[in-house]
Amino acid sequence: MSTDKQYYDSILANLANFDSYYNSKVTRKKRANEHPLDDGIRQKLADLIVTGKENELFEKLSMVQEIWISLIKKSIICLRYYDTREPFLQNRSKTPLAYGTDSLLDYFKKYTDFESLLYGGANHYRDHVVHVFRVWLLGIDILLRNNCQYLDKIKIDQYCLINPLEKLSVWTLISLSHDLGYPLEKSLQIVEKTRDMMKNFVTNPIMNMDIDFSGVQNNMNDFVLRFMSSKMHKKDGEHDLYVARLQPKYYFKFQKSLEHNTHGIISSLIIYKLLIFFMESDYSLHEDYTFDKEDVRQYYIRREILRAIASHTCPDVYQLNMCNMSYLLILCDESQDWGRKSLTNLYVDDNVKYTFKDVDIDMGSTPFVCKVQDSYNISGGDVEQSILRILKRFLGQSKTYRILFRDGQDTAKRDFDFHRIVEIEPTNSKRFEVDLKITTNAQAQIVVTQTRGRFSENDAFNKAFKAVFPGCEVDPAAKTLKVSIESE
């Protein structure tokens, strides 16, 4: 059974609990007809994930596109429905529409067509069309597990109380839109490689495909960056009125991200400019521009979507809380690795079987504990080189997590411990577990445990391990090896 089918079956098993949870939170008169888990979406999912074949989604790419835009539309419709400034809650004869989604779908189709070029343009480029759907699927499963425990606890801001369907809609827009800017970012790298190649026969080749903005475009981008980088404060002397204040750290970090053309910030700009839902946002930093409670709530909903998307490629923004959308996107985006092949993988005999095990979240402990687990089974071939590739990739991921979950101002308040666990089985007689531990009360470290067999001086694992961690010796008598690493 494919990983996609496993997660779909898990979601299916939890839908009844979700329905009960949702019904307990929202009265019958206020239940939206359209949302990301309505009957129409449930039927589309049932038609999409049927056989359990590993490549089923790639064989049904047109259906993936169809459900992608349906989910986007239903999410916007749901969010508009619960906006009390609009007429839909009071007048059920009126139905909200998702304006701008035709333009977004047109962009997404071009994105899909263009992706085939990117496979040949970068050795390590991997699918991002099916990927975003899988990220959504994994996130939905996490939100619905254990009687919707994570869905219940996830929040946006103290001034932004949202119901379960609004939370699902926010997650849907974040997960399905977070990589829209990827082709633009990658195209620049392809141009750089072409320019470098041309230097062999052309002196100072002139090729320019920088994403330059000028005039009004710069002003528009700056407005969106300020929108993402602000928060609301109660106006002095006014009980129910608020004013917006810029958060300079966020603003500078997102400016830096845009300067480097990272696809997260570009994706945020794309959806803000294409979807009327965002263009209708109320926002100003002027002191005399005030917001009431619903204005504030709607501002935070939109800011959460844009900020989460921008933050997932902005390592300068570190994470303090597990129960927010930004954390969930990073978790699901980094974890979704099943079924993704790069150009390099397609032309190399693969003696390594990869299995994604799960994302396990324990919300019953203090602090919360999050574990991302997968495994590699190596059969034949150059075992040492296979282990070396796995460990190098693990080290790269570890660096990403250590930066995102690094210590900084207010990190004493961090409410979670994080584990990234990889199980490596090079032969039938040996098995090793490599665990990146980032905890609230200790320095980050990597712990290697032999779960079957013994360490030995000349085996493939020891050689690969010493190549990745120079100076670290494996003690054959030990069952566990700890490697201290500095948070970056």
Predicted regions located by residue number:
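C-terminal effector/catalytic modules and regulatory tails appended to multi-domain proteins
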Residues: 2-110, 332-335, 339, 343-488
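Alpha-helical phosphate/pyrophosphate-handling elements in metalloenzyme active cores
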Residues: 35-38, 42-59, 63-86, 114, ...
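Active-site-adjacent bridging/hinge elements
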Residues: 101-116, 234-247
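Broad hydrophobic/π-residue packing in well-ordered secondary structure
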Residues: 121, 126-129, 183-185, 270, ...
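Divalent metal-dependent catalytic cores for phosphoryl transfer on phosphate-bearing substrates
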Residues: 161-357
